[in-house]
C-alpha cells in the first residue's frame, strides 16, 4: 500500500507501508483542516476517533489526500 505522509496543493510525500499495514489515514482537530495539524500515514487498523479529532481511514493507494 502507498499512503501519503504529507500533502499540499504543491507537493505530496508518499510512504510505502510495511507488510500488514493496509490502511491509509489522516487525522486532524475538528474545525482545522490545513497543515501542519493534519497527520497522515499507514496503519494496520483504522485509528480510533478521539474527542475533537476527525479520523479518515481508507484502503486504496494515496486515498488519504
From Swiss-Prot:
Record keywords: Blood coagulation cascade inhibiting toxin, Disulfide bond, Hemostasis impairing toxin, Neurotoxin, Secreted, Toxin
InterPro entries: Snake_3FTx, Snake_toxin-like_sf, Snake_toxin_con_site, Toxin_cobra-type
Disulphide bridges: 3-24, 17-42, 46-57, 58-63
Gene3D superfamilies named among the record's database cross-references: CD59
Tissue-by-tissue expression: Expressed by the venom gland.
GO MF annotations, alphabetized: toxin activity
Location within or outside the cell: Secreted
Family classification: Belongs to the three-finger toxin family. Short-chain subfamily. Orphan group I sub-subfamily.
Annotated function: Has anticoagulant activity, since it is able to inhibit the activation of coagulation factor X (F10) by coagulation factor VIIa (F7) (IC(50)=123.8 nM). Also shows weak irreversible neurotoxicity.
Protein name, UniProt field: Ringhalexin
Organism for this UniProt entry: Hemachatus haemachatus (Rinkhals)
Amino acid at each position: 500500500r502507498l499512503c501519503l505522509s504529507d500533502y499540499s496543493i504543491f507537493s505530496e510525500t508518499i510512504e510505502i507501508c510495511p507488510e500488514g499495514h493496509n490502511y491509509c489515514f489522516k487525522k486532524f482537530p475538528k474545525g482545522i483542516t490545513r497543515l501542519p495539524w493534519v497527520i497522515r500515514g499507514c496503519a494496520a487498523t483504522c485509528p480510533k476517533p478521539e474527542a475533537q479529532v476527525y479520523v479518515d481511514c481508507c484502503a486504496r493507494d494515496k486515498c488519504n489526500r
